[in-house]
């Protein structure tokens, strides 16, 4: 898409923050009792729909989680694994060796590691491994190529030949039979894309990693529930499988966003391409281990999450998606983005009101 498509992000951000400010301010500027039933109704809807989504996990739908048969090697499609790596000298060799040991026909599997302008020993390690393993293909980009992870993945697309693409992070870990089970799931559900449940490898490192492990499990539970009530499911970057034809039809990976997975999820939704969620096997990754890294990560997620609504909001209001999907998106937009900001404004107004009463 053109740069002009994204030029109104700041204006939309201002409008969004202003709306949150007003929603928090109006009850304080008036008699709050007048808004009691409105707040009560909204709270009931939020809790009720959340309980429905969670409860659906106790009735695991066959198409969501169980497989009636194992797909044969003859039926398996050609798969290209894509990994964008920058300064990953500590994990890249381990990743390559694990990928090469996955159960999958060797004539149907290609591994592409994109060296995205690394300044450490990653290029040297990849050069050595590419001479050692024929299935490994290394694609290199200059440090100033631009586009981030999306740019690296788009650059590698022209070298791929498979029907399906599996995007992994450099710290990803898969079970040996993950690919076989993944395509058995694809065949039964007729999905255009599939997201593997994410799991944490360093869960016992500290309190933060333990919390992230629980968070990932809860996210998968919500994803299951949303999908089972005909809501919206989303990709999560690491461990996302997508049909190459579908990706190209959607315009490839968006290089003008900080969360290409969330952006792509909405574009797939608008094109009526179905995203499945597979609980087992999971894709395992390392959780961030310190608070500064966690805050930076969450800031990026929040920014990218809002960007997609600003970019595609007008299309989401059209008939391209059904009413239940619109409700689901609205619900999680309010829950994840609007309510936290409204709560901050509300807290500020409450403290200001309390201080004013104290000084009277």
Label the predicted regions.
Residues 130, 134-163, 176-258, 295, ...:
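Long helical/loop segments within the catalytic core of UDP-sugar-dependent glycosyltransferases
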Residues 48-108:
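N-terminal signal-anchor transmembrane helix
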């Amino acid at each position: 898409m053109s740069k002009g498509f994204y030029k109104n992000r700041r204006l939309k951000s201002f409008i969004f923050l202003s709306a949150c400010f007003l929603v928090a301010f109006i009850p304080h500027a008036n008699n709050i009792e007048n808004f009691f039933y409105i707040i009560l109704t909204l709270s009931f809807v939020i809790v009720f729909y959340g309980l429905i989504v969670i409860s659906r996990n106790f009735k695991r739908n066959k198409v969501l989680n169980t497989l009636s048969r194992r797909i044969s090697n003859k039926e398996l499609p050609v798969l290209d694994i894509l990994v964008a790596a920058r300064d990953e000298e500590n994990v890249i060799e381990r990743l390559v060796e694990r990928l090469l040991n996955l159960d999958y026909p060797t004539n149907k599997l290609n591994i592409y590691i994109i060296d995205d302008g690394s300044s450490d020993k990653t290029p040297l390690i990849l050069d050595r491994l590419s001479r050692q393993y024929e299935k490994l293909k290394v694609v290199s980009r200059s440090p100033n190529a631009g586009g981030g992870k999306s740019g690296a993945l788009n650059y590698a697309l022209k070298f791929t030949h498979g029907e399906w693409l599996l995007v992994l992070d450099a710290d990803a870990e898969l079970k040996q039979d993950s690919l076989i089970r993944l395509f058995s799931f694809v065949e039964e559900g007729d999905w255009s894309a599939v997201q593997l449940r994410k799991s944490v490898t360093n869960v016992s490192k500290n309190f933060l990693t333990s919390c992230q492990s629980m968070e990932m499990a809860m996210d998968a539970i919500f994803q299951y529930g949303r999908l089972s009530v005909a809501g919206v499911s989303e990709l999560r970057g690491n461990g996302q499988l997508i049909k190459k034809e579908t990706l190209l039809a959607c315009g490839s990976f968006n290089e003008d966003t900080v969360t290409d997975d969330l952006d792509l999820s909405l574009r797939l939704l608008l094109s009526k391409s179905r995203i499945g969620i597979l609980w087992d096997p999971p894709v395992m990754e390392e959780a961030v281990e310190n608070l500064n890294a966690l805050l930076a990560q969450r800031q990026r997620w929040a920014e990218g999450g809002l960007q997609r609504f600003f970019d595609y909001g007008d299309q989401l209001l059209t008939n391209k998606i059904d009413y239940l999907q619109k409700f689901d998106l609205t619900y999680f937009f309010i829950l994840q983005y609007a309510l936290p900001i409204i709560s901050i404004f509300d807290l500020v107004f409450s403290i200001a009101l309390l201080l004013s009463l104290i000084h009277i």
